[in-house]
């Protein structure tokens, strides 16, 4: 299985060079464009050049190709958006999430869902009685070089409005759709920044109607029952655990920048972590040895800034008790009964089964009178 469509803000500087002015404006409007990955891989495998994106791979009429012929079909009742991490070229993003989609398809079938990644698959997509989950990707300008960590983080933050525009646009076309975001590594940093900026009203999505405005309301301002994202899966998140916490005991008041976005705009978030993640261990060393040392040097002149502290990664640790109540953590090592490294999440059956279970639960009404128990691999309550 290969994911057919990726939305991306890669190579924007060369976008629309071979099209007329109106088409170019339309392609630039939302901060991302759609790419036919079948055509892109034909280019990449022929040239082995990941640095270029020929005009022929860009979908000029995405409304017809991506939406009318795929995502807007009545049979499609859920959409998964996968977004990758640091040091991932475009073809690498496709490979990783196609592996995940392939594994997830079998797991979801046990729950009577059919995952579809290409409208040309042998599935009756016009049958509205089908219960289809469409899988698309979102790729941001990760440089694909090991030494570009900081520049990738900058690109990651700058890509947040584009991802928000994508989700908002999907919701304008299918108001009742359930949207699940699966982010790996630094992709979680991107999603968390998007949520932070939305809840703080740093920007608004380009496509914004009353229904979406309600989804963007904080719970304490009337947004109790609708959410911008239904389920958010964080695989090996390259996010500081203190960034998702709220500390207000005694004299140590601190609210992490991502706390409110996760609390108010996502119905449930699920963190999958492993203490054997070598990439995140290296990231912790880099932040501790370089970034925090430089920051504390600056603070000799500017005074302390508690927002700029680095402690340990969320992807290496159990979820802190100070995180929002709608965020849950899952120990990937316990789930799989083996050591899980940074790239092992995409096709580990036990992890994928857990994701499928959570998606299934998102579409099942719970009965609160039933007794609860706790999974050994999660702090998530389960029905007996």
Swiss-Prot record:
SUPFAM superfamilies: alpha/beta-Hydrolases (SSF53474)
Protein name listed in UniProt: Uncharacterized protein alr1448
Domain of life: Bacteria
The keyword Thylakoid is assigned to this record: no
Any one biological process term the GO annotation gives: nitrogen fixation
Origin species: Nostoc sp. (strain PCC 7120 / SAG 25.82 / UTEX 2576)
Keywords: Nitrogen fixation
Stored InterPro entries: AB_hydrolase_fold, DUF900_hydrolase
A Pfam family of this chain: DUF900
PANTHER family for the chain: ABC TRANSMEMBRANE TYPE-1 DOMAIN-CONTAINING PROTEIN (PTHR36513), TRANSMEMBRANE PROTEIN (PTHR36513:SF1)
